[in-house]
Design a protein with these regions (language model features):
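Feature captures the catalytic ectodomains and active-site-proximal regions of enzymes
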Residues: 1-180
Length: 180
């Protein structure tokens, strides 16, 4: 028996570079996310499955691209397994990697999720995901913790996922000025 999930025809989409003018790369261990990145016209960089290996890949290829999409699967897997402690541990591992990311001096750094996976539900859910946006041009807010409730009260408020890249491009000075 063969079970095909989300099987469809290959859509014709503009590449990431055509749409946003950026050379984009994806660092992802999980095949579905590599496939989505390829569909978006990103170069898929070979990497390992740990955050340390993904960070090493990022550092090694830092000068070659304008945009990096780094996918960490462990937080999602822990949520699907209903393992709250493992989810906390995975998130803390991402937290520990942030100083190394900031040391690369990105124009913009965004940390978020593609969906919420609460350990209590053991499944993807409708809940909003927190978003951390760091750039020299960001206005500081009063948020000191990273979580759904805290981030919703921050400077970005409730942001639709389709708006995130535009906000990132604005903070990177990559949008065409409009108005006076």
């Amino acid at each position: 028996m063969v079970l095909l999930r989300s099987f469809a025809r290959h859509p014709v989409l503009p590449t990431f570079r055509e749409r946003f003018g950026l050379r984009a790369a994806a660092i992802a261990a999980y095949p579905m996310y590599r496939g989505l990145a390829r569909l978006a016209g990103m170069e898929i960089l070979p990497t390992g499955t740990t955050i340390a290996e993904q960070l090493a890949t990022l550092k090694e290829r830092w000068a070659d691209f304008d945009f990096f999409y780094v996918h960490v699967k462990r937080t999602d897997t822990a949520g699907e397994d209903g393992d709250f402690a493992a989810k906390v541990k995975a998130i803390e591992e991402v937290d520990r990697a942030l100083p190394a990311l900031v040391s690369l001096r990105p124009d913009v750094l965004a940390v978020t999720g593609d969906h919420s996976t609460p350990a209590t539900l053991r499944a993807h859910s409708w809940h909003p995901v927190p978003v951390l946006l760091w750039a020299k041009t960001c206005r500081p807010d009063t948020v000191t913790t990273f979580g759904e409730r805290a981030c919703a009260a921050g400077g970005l408020g409730h942001l639709a996922g389709r708006e995130l890249l535009t906000v990132m491009l604005a903070h990177a000075g990559r949008l065409t000025k409009f108005g006076a």
